[in-house]
Design a protein with these regions (language model features):
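Domain-level signature for proteins that mediate thiol-based redox and metal-cofactor handling
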Residues: 1-50, 55-235
Length: 235
């Protein structure tokens, strides 16, 4: 029988598109209710502000609906976004499986797919910094970094997260793939281009971490309860 733990585990795969972190860890899941028989699930989501971008919000609600619906034994799924200026449109659109363009008239077709890919690209850059910065601190030279493969990097959660994000973009992600790849061509980043690539990766990661900290702080200020599955920020 499906329980809350299984549903929250499924929601761990749903990410804030901008922050590239699970909605559970961020505290965005305010409640998760499973019926006695395990067939009906209701999830309520919350966000740091009333005016969070509706396209971001729609992505998270729709992804949460898909994740919960895919849990074995679940027959009826309801995912609701609370306390947001576009809650009604988002909740109705997701429940009707209408899509963002139908729910928000006038938005460009395919906008969400483009937005998602843009943020995954940023996640790849941020992940590159998290994997490469310890290597640089340990004395790895530009020549060494340019010659390394993904499998040469230490087997850390950050490396596997980077591998997953690269796979989502169709970029080389096997152990024999270059550690540093061009996001457009998928080819290896050469020694000459490496400093600029690493600077871009570092800037992207710093911005992402700063945004994550701000969002967590705003959420805590807005709500005085912890979310289901929330993980305390590591500083």
């Amino acid at each position: 029988m499906t329980g809350q733990a299984e549903v929250l585990a499924a929601l761990d795969a749903v990410r804030d598109p901008e922050l590239d972190e699970p909605v559970t860890a961020l505290g965005f899941v305010s409640s998760c209710t499973v019926s006695d028989g395990g067939t009906d699930v209701q999830v309520r989501l919350r966000l740091p502000t009333y005016f969070c971008a509706p396209n971001f919000a729609f992505l998270m609600v729709a992804d949460a609906y898909d994740a919960v619906s895919a849990v074995h034994g679940v027959e009826r799924t309801e995912v609701l976004l609370d306390d947001h200026f576009a809650s009604d449109a988002i909740n109705h659109g997701v429940a009707a499986r209408a899509g963002f363009e139908v729910s928000f008239e006038g938005e460009a077709a395919g906008e969400l797919d483009t937005l998602r890919r843009d943020f995954v690209r940023k996640a790849v850059l941020a992940g590159t910094d998290r994997v490469c910065r310890p290597l640089v601190a340990g004395g790895a030279t530009p020549d060494r970094l340019a010659a390394m493969t993904l499998g040469d990097a230490p087997p850390t959660p950050d490396r596997e997260r980077l591998r997953e994000r690269r796979s989502e973009l169709g970029l080389p992600a096997g152990d024999d793939a270059p550690l540093l790849v061009d996001l457009t061509t998928g080819g290896a980043v050469g020694v000459e281009a490496l400093p600029l690539h690493l600077r871009r990766a570092r800037l992207t990661n710093v911005n992402t971490e700063a945004n994550s900290s701000v969002c967590r702080g705003m959420l805590q200020h807005r709500y005085d309860t912890r979310g289901q599955g929330e993980v305390e920020e590591v500083r």
